[in-house]
């Protein structure tokens, strides 16, 4: 397996349509953008429509997120992709990685604004490389549910992905995230439970509290004088 570590910064996407979560995390500056799909919209009580996408796009940009990803839907993916493209320049279009999706990506001719999604195989990553799309989204936890060699498949995907960026999705725990990051994967779609917790540390919280308590205490004048003089 190639070691991709340090070839580019860590890119983290917030994988939810919950705008309250967007607002809570916007000022951290940790997230490259937002990823969504029809299931995530449904879980947030939203209809999947171009109108909804337009509203979410405006909200995301108002909060300072650099980009947002919307997935094609309906019976005419090309027409839907063109409508998503027209929402604005910060939109990335998610297209399922099957034969129909490859055709849509080719006709759209905007590889820098495409994510091929629902990726489970090395062959799908090869197709993404051939199409030179910006992102390819393999589903980690779902693949682990389906096969015993998911980690081996992911390592091969990483070796194949020379130009397209693997945007790792379907994560169920912070441990899964940390394990993949330690192996050189550097672009992730983080669901809300992980996005709000991965950077936290109870030990860090204790240390920060100790610093603040020390800052508020009256210093021992004798000890302070001794340290200054010595």
Question: Language-model segments: what does each one mean?
Answer:
Residues 38-41, 134-145, 185-204:
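Glycine-rich phosphate-binding active-site loops on the catalytic face of alpha/beta enzymes
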Residues 152-156, 197-230:
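C-terminal helical cap(s) of enzyme catalytic domains, especially alpha/beta-barrels
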Residues 29-33, 86-91, 107-115, 130-137, ...:
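Glycine-enriched alpha-helix->loop->beta-strand junction motifs that scaffold or abut catalytic
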Residues 13-15, 67-75, 89-99, 112-126, ...:
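Catalytic beta/alpha-barrel core
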Residues 7-8, 13, 18-22, 28-30, ...:
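Active-site beta->alpha loop and helix N-cap motifs at the rims of alpha/beta catalytic domains
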Residues 37, 93, 128, 180, ...:
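Conserved, mostly hydrophobic/aromatic
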Residues 45-55, 75-80, 94-110, 120-127, ...:
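Active-site-adjacent beta->alpha loops and helix N-cap segments on the catalytic face
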Residues 20-28, 79-83, 104, 121-131, ...:
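Catalytic cores of alpha/beta
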């Amino acid at each position: 397996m190639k070691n991709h570590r340090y070839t580019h910064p860590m890119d983290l996407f917030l994988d939810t349509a919950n705008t309250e979560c967007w607002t809570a995390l916007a000022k951290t500056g940790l997230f490259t953008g937002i990823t969504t799909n029809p299931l995530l919209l449904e879980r947030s009580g939203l209809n999947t429509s171009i109108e909804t996408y337009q509203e979410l796009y405006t909200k995301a940009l108002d909060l300072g997120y650099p980009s947002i990803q919307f997935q094609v839907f309906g019976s005419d993916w090309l027409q839907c992709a063109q409508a998503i493209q027209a929402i604005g320049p910060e939109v990335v279009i998610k297209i399922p990685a099957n034969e129909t999706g490859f055709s849509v990506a080719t006709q759209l001719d905007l590889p820098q604004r495409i994510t091929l999604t629902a990726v489970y195989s090395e062959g799908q990553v090869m197709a993404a490389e051939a199409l030179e799309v910006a992102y390819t989204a393999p589903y980690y936890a779902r693949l682990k549910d389906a096969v015993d060699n998911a980690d081996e498949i992911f390592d091969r995907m990483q070796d194949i992905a020379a130009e397209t960026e693997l945007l790792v999705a379907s994560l169920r725990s912070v441990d899964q995230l940390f394990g993949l990051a330690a192996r050189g994967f550097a672009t992730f779609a983080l669901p809300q439970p992980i996005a709000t917790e991965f950077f936290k540390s109870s030990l860090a919280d204790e240390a920060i509290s100790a610093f603040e308590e020390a800052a508020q205490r009256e210093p021992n004048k004798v000890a302070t004088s001794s340290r200054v003089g010595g």
